[in-house]
């Protein structure tokens, strides 16, 4: 027998999370997660799932019937879209302007499909003209995949225009909205988005570990008419939706849902609906403007041009001669404040300051600016 390990209960300090995610969680959401666990087929829980589906539809601004939360983080939402829709040998136009566009490419190739890359410089949005050129050059392409809000750089791409191009050239669109949902304008039905995924831990200010997804009727038809089986049993939407949708008043067991995490997502989306999604978009922009003014006063420069800058993810260049890790460590130690390091091509060159969900508040902006001023001077 192995000896029993002895540890104290883990009791972390209260941090101010102003990095690229997770974000500060609403107190009401933490309280919701602590409520009594019930069975995942309990009638009361099933009724809550129906409400949760409606709340996800509201956040995405869609009436898509195939809308639900994947029982895993945003990366699983990404895989859900690719593994359900893309078949071996199919061609996918993949837009790559940061880390998460590259992850899309990897997903495409892992399902045996062909990725046609449209590369844009890090810190810039996806270029619609380059996308149209790729669509013209590849008339057999079935999908256009892009990141709406690139978390690695803070760049916002024009999803409305890109999805219109996909439709024009007969492609389905697959959109990463992990950082954009709840933080900037996003209208799934109006913009004609076919498959979209997000994460619970960014602008929804929920606990990490869930991924809202939605498929358009056209995407559902593509799934129904696959020539090959979906390669993942766990992520197979044709199976999962039998749990999320009542067929003749009965739900089919697929897996044990993360019951308490779904309580939390229900509460975070309920708070979003209570605030109003357009008001949430405006709040993120308003707080960004306050942060921007303070950062510029400190002489800090943004990675992304103003016209394509995410309000909820602010990437700023690290001043010359400043120790990246030392600054972040001191912010955490002295102020309980977390900001993010650069990722990929921006590693060691930039910090990423998040203003997401519950974190997009004046007191957080004031703390961040004061802390940076004191640490840098």
List PLM regions with ranges:
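N-terminal "arm"/small-domain region of PLP-dependent enzymes with the aminotransferase-like
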Residues: 1-43
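PLP-dependent enzyme catalytic core of the Aspartate aminotransferase-like
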Residues: 10, 345, 349-377
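Active-site C-terminal subdomain of aminotransferase-like
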Residues: 24-25, 201-293, 297
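Conserved N-terminal alpha-helix of the aminotransferase class I/II PLP-enzyme fold
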Residues: 32-80, 99, 103-109
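Conserved PLP-anchoring active-site segment centered on the Schiff-base-forming lysine
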Residues: 86-102
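Active-site phosphate-binding strand-loop segment of PLP-dependent enzymes
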Residues: 125-182, 195, 203
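Conserved active-site segment immediately N-terminal to the catalytic lysine
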Residues: 189-201
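Conserved PLP-binding catalytic core of the aspartate aminotransferase-like
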Residues: 301-334
């Amino acid at each position: 027998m192995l000896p029993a390990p002895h540890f104290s209960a883990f009791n972390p300090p209260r941090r101010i999370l102003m990095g690229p995610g997770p974000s500060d969680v609403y107190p009401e959401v933490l309280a919701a997660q602590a409520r009594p666990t019930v069975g995942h087929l309990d009638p009361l829980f099933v009724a809550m799932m129906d409400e949760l589906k409606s709340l996800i539809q509201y956040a995405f601004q869609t009436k898509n019937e195939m809308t639900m939360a994947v029982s895993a983080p945003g990366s699983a939402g990404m895989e859900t879209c690719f593994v359900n829709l893309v078949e071996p040998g199919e061609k996918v136009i993949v837009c790559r302007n940061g880390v998460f566009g590259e992850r899309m490419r990897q997903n495409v190739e892992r399902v045996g499909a062909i990725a046609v890359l449209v590369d844009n410089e890090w810190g810039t949005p996806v270029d619609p003209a380059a996308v149209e050129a790729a669509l013209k050059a590849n008339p057999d392409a079935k999908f256009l995949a892009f990141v709406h809000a690139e978390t690695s750089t803070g760049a916002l791409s024009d999803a409305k225009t890109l999805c219109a191009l996909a439709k024009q050239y007969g492609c389905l669109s697959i959109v990463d909205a992990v950082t954009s949902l709840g933080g900037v304008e996003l209208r799934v039905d109006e913009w004609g988005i076919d498959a979209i995924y997000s994460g619970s831990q960014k602008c929804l200010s929920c606990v990490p570990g869930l991924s809202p997804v939605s498929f358009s009727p056209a995407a559902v038809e593509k799934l129904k008419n696959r020539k090959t089986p979906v390669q993942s049993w766990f992520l197979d939407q044709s199976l999962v939706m039998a749990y999320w949708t009542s067929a003749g008043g009965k739900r089919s067991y697929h897996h044990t849902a993360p019951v308490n995490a779904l309580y939390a997502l229900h509460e975070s989306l309920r708070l979003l609906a209570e605030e109003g999604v357009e008001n949430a978009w405006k709040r993120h922009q308003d707080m960004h403007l306050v942060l921007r003014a303070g950062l510029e006063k400190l002489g800090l420069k943004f990675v992304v041009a103003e016209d394509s800058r995410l309000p909820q993810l602010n990437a700023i260049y690290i001043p010359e001669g400043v120790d990246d890790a030392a600054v972040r460590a001191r912010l955490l130690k002295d102020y309980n404040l977390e900001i993010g390091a650069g990722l990929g091509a921006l590693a060691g060159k930039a910090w990423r300051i998040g203003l997401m969900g519950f974190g997009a508040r004046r007191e957080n902006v004031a703390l961040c600016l004061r802390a940076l001023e004191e640490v840098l001077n």
